[in-house]
UniProtKB/Swiss-Prot annotation:
This is YcgL domain-containing protein HD_1373. It comes from Haemophilus ducreyi (strain 35000HP / ATCC 700724). InterPro entries: YcgL-like_sf, YcgL_dom. It comes from the Bacteria. Gene3D superfamilies: YcgL domain. Pfam families: YcgL. Residues 8-92 form the YcgL domain.
């Protein structure tokens, strides 16, 4: 499937049910290219912002061009952030090693 983007802007949504999960689509509130099963898993999307993928500002965790290509070819890009570090667990491991 090929998605026609009107510009290099995309709409970014965060999942309210899955921490660190973001969905990038070509146009705000146009989820028709996103599989229904993915939308159900994602939960109610909360709009974050419009973002210029061709601009000078890079995304923090993913490459702008990778997102743009995914949107153009499959209609969306799903970002799943790595889990947060468990600092307590790391501390306890280090504390145990020092004994």
């Amino acid at each position: 499937m090929y998605i026609v983007m009107n510009s290099n802007f995309c709409a970014i949504y965060k999942s309210m049910s899955k921490e660190g999960m973001f969905l990038y689509i070509a146009q705000r509130d146009k989820f028709n290219a996103v599989p229904e099963q993915l939308l159900q898993m994602f939960g109610k999307p909360q709009f974050v912002m419009l973002f210029n993928l061709a601009g000078e500002k890079p995304l923090k965790q993913v490459n702008n061009q990778d997102v743009l290509l995914a949107i153009k070819t499959q209609g969306f890009f799903l970002q799943i952030s790595p889990p947060a570090e468990n600092l307590l667990k790391q501390f306890l491991i280090q504390k145990g090693e020092k004994k």
